[in-house]
From Swiss-Prot:
GO terms for molecular function: ATP binding; hydroxyethylthiazole kinase activity; magnesium ion binding. The keyword Acetylation does not apply. The keyword Heme does not apply. It comes from Lacticaseibacillus paracasei (strain ATCC 334 / BCRC 17002 / CCUG 31169 / CIP 107868 / KCTC 3260 / NRRL B-441). It catalyses: 5-(2-hydroxyethyl)-4-methylthiazole + ATP = 4-methyl-5-(2-phosphooxyethyl)-thiazole + ADP + H(+). This is Hydroxyethylthiazole kinase. Its EC number is 2.7.1.50. Substrate binds at residues 50, 205. CDD domains: THZ_kinase. ATP binds at residues 125, 178. Catalyzes the phosphorylation of the hydroxyl group of 4-methyl-5-beta-hydroxyethylthiazole (THZ). Keywords: ATP-binding, Kinase, Magnesium, Metal-binding, Nucleotide-binding, Thiamine biosynthesis, Transferase.
Length: 280
């Protein structure tokens, strides 16, 4: 029998948000969503720094509490910076999130993702189609978007099994595949998260923001699984509230409402009652 996600991670849900400290999150990311990610971190009272020059790594790593590596915009220089940061994080025990943006689209990103995995990051995430490609399963994703064809019950179970195999080689890494149902897999278990609304797929940067939120929670000392489950659930609940308040507005208003809720929802005592998900 499955167990409710809020029962499994009860303490984390009760204490993680609002933040009681302001973790500094170093983000090596893309130009498309960098402003959204920085503001999302500020909205939850974390602190962002978008520093991707290797020459500054020793000083920034000495100050930061977590690292986010996002593959959203690749160049030769950025690839080298991502690889260098991954190694630096492993050497300094910096909590790290790898966001596999576009890994289902090109061989270069697939190879880079696996190079970064060798450093045993805390979290590796992507949409369902990206994570299927990363796990060497057939993926029907196009560009950086996930495909509905990859989100059937059978496909989700297949991906869960493949990611569980990956945890045998990387037991300290938690894997997240986002979609209509979000899949979280680690050496400790498998969880389905079931919040969210379709509109979240219709403005750019939602996955990037989730990666930043996970990194912030890791920076407070939360363990990998709890950081992933709380961050994903919180962001999806923000989207649900925004959708309920924006029944006649367009997507731009929905986007603004979702981002507004990042700074508001955690102060609502009953937001935990919104959370839906289960342990398998």
């Amino acid at each position: 029998m499955s167990k409710a996600i809020t029962d499994v991670f009860y303490t984390a849900f009760k204490t993680a948000l609002p933040l009681t400290s302001s973790p500094l999150v170093q983000c090596i990311t893309n130009e498309i969503t960098v402003e959204s990610m920085a503001n999302a971190l500020l909205y939850i009272d974390a602190k962002p720094v978008m520093a991707d020059d290797q020459r500054e790594f020793p000083e920034f790593f000495a100050q930061s509490d977590a690292l986010l590596l996002n593959l959203g915009h690749i160049s030769e220089v950025r690839q080298q910076n991502l690889l260098a940061a991954g190694k630096f994080a492993q050497a300094t025990n910096q909590p790290t999130v790898i966001d596999l943006v576009g890994v289902s689209a090109t061989q270069l990103r697939y190879d880079l993702g696996h190079q970064l995995l060798v450093n045993h990051p805390n979290v590796v995430k992507g949409n369902i189609s990206e994570m299927r490609r990363f796990a060497d399963l057939k993926s029907t994703g196009r560009g950086v978007d996930g495909s509905q064809l990859d989100q059937s019950v059978t496909a989700l179970g297949e991906l869960a099994a493949s990611l569980q195999q990956l945890t045998q080689a990387f037991p300290t890494t938690t894997f997240l595949a986002t979609g209509k149902i979000d899949l979280v897999v680690s050496a400790k278990g498998t969880w389905y998260l079931k919040n969210g609304v379709p509109q979240l797929d219709r403005f750019t940067g939602t996955g990037d923001i989730v990666g930043a939120l996970i990194a912030a929670l890791l920076g407070t000392g939360l363990d990998n699984d709890a950081a992933v489950v709380v961050a994903v659930s919180y962001f999806n609940c923000c989207g649900e509230v925004a959708a309920a308040q924006n029944r006649t507005g367009g997507l731009a208003a929905f986007r603004e409402g979702t981002l507004n809720q990042l700074s508001l929802l955690a102060a609502t005592a009953d937001w935990l009652q919104m959370v839906k998900g289960e342990a398998l």
